[in-house]
Every structure is written in C-alpha cells, then in structure tokens.
Curated annotation (Swiss-Prot):
Pathway(s) it belongs to: Cofactor biosynthesis; (R)-pantothenate biosynthesis; (R)-pantoate from 3-methyl-2-oxobutanoate: step 1/2
Organism listed in the record: Bdellovibrio bacteriovorus (strain ATCC 15356 / DSM 50701 / NCIMB 9529 / HD100)
Bound cofactor: record note: Binds 1 Mg(2+) ion per subunit.
Protein name: 3-methyl-2-oxobutanoate hydroxymethyltransferase
Phylogenetic classification of the source organism: Bacteria, Pseudomonadati, Bdellovibrionota, Bdellovibrionia, Bdellovibrionales
UniProt KW keywords: Cytoplasm, Magnesium, Metal-binding, Pantothenate biosynthesis, Transferase
Amino acid sequence: MKTILDFHDKKSKKQKISMITCYDYSFARIVADSDIDCILVGDSLAMVMLGHSTTLDVSASVMAHHTAAVVRGAGDKFVIADLPFMSYRKGLTANMTAVEKVMKAGAHAVKLEGAAGNLKLVRHLVDSGVPVMGHLGLTPQSVNQLGGFKVQGRDEKAQKKILEAALQLQDAGAFSVVLECVPSKLAKEITAALEIPTIGIGAGVDCDGQVLVLQDMLGMNQGFKPKFVKTYLDGFNTIKGALNQYHQEVSTEIFPSEKESYS
C-alpha cells in the first residue's frame, strides 16, 4: 500500500488491511520485506521502547526521531505516525508544529486519538494535504480519564457516542479509523456505517483491517498478553536462548573460531 487510495480500494474489494507498529530501522527493514500492508509508528513506543507505564511520556520530537528511523527502512510501505499526547490541544499553530515534525521525518499520514475537540484540526490537516487516521474506543492517551486500560462501548450510550464520533471523523476527512478495545458487535456496526476503512485492535473480526504491536505479536513482552493479542513467535525465549548460547561459546572459547578470525 502506497497511498490512502489503497485503503479505500481494499475496503471496496473486501480485502483485509494488515497494519503493524514499528519503531526502528532494523525492524522496519524486515516489515518492508514482508506482506504487511502498512506501518504505524505508534506512541506506544513510550511503553515498548522507552519503558514508560503509559503512552503519555513521549514528545513530538521523539515521535519524529523514531518515524525517521522507520521510514529509512520501510521501503514503499505506507507509514502513519501518531501525534503524541497534548500535541494537538494547544491551538492550530502548536498543532501544526507537531505535525510538521513527523511529516518532515517522512510519515505519509498522522493518527490522532478521539473526535471531540479534534474535528476542526482534522479538517485543517486534510485541507492542508495531510492524511489523517482517527482512533476511537480505548484511546491510551486518555487512560487517566478512562480509568485505565478498559474495554469501551459496553453500554448503549457509549456505543452511540463512539459511532457518532466515527461518522464525524469521516465527515471531517479522515481516511481511516482505528477501533481499539470495543465490543465486536459495535465494531461491526461502525464498519458497516462507514465508507472509510476501520482498523481493529481488540475489536473483533469484522473490521476492515487489524493492527498489533510488533513486539506483542512476536512474543517479546514476557508476562504481558492482553486478550486481543495473538503471538506468532516465542520471541523472548528465542532471543534469550541465542544470547545464552553466545555467552556459553565465548566462555568456552568456541567463539570466535578460525572461521570468524583473520589470518
């Protein structure tokens, strides 16, 4: 996928969209050589790469730094960058400063969380030529307001609010919307109501696509496995095993051998 038109094309053809998070050049090169459709440089890097407990502790400069690294390795993959917490709550001038940083880093689009208070910005960005992906349901930047990482849209009132927000984002010009941790039935209803594609994470099978955190699906975060995550590799133990083997071979003088030495 190379443009936002490919997102709409996939939805119209009922072809699922695969999106994965990525935060660095080395992994981006692997993703570039895979069948994955698009990359999200998520503000989840605050937790995954920097060890913070939430996504709140990341700046636009940090997002731009990681976005640039990913873009250098991503080949022709479509790259979306998150706008970090509070970067789009300071008026249009400050908003555009954050957007400019990640777009100049090479992102093809930006993602922002929520709809209330953001619709004017979405319209402004779209009118300025910046593609925007929305994000509804569990919005990690609002974790304190939401009372933690919880499923959203359980009751009828909340479901109606999320559906209305999705329609508002579409009307404002968003090319896609992420639905995170919402009941499958609600995600199905929203997907059917929208002309733009939905990307689910913990939102059931009926979304137009799916996204996972790369390190989660590779099984690298031992002891952390939300219900919506499927692991495709025991990455933690595989990598640990390689490190232990390296240590053992160094300790016993198996490595380096003559093969890895110069004459």
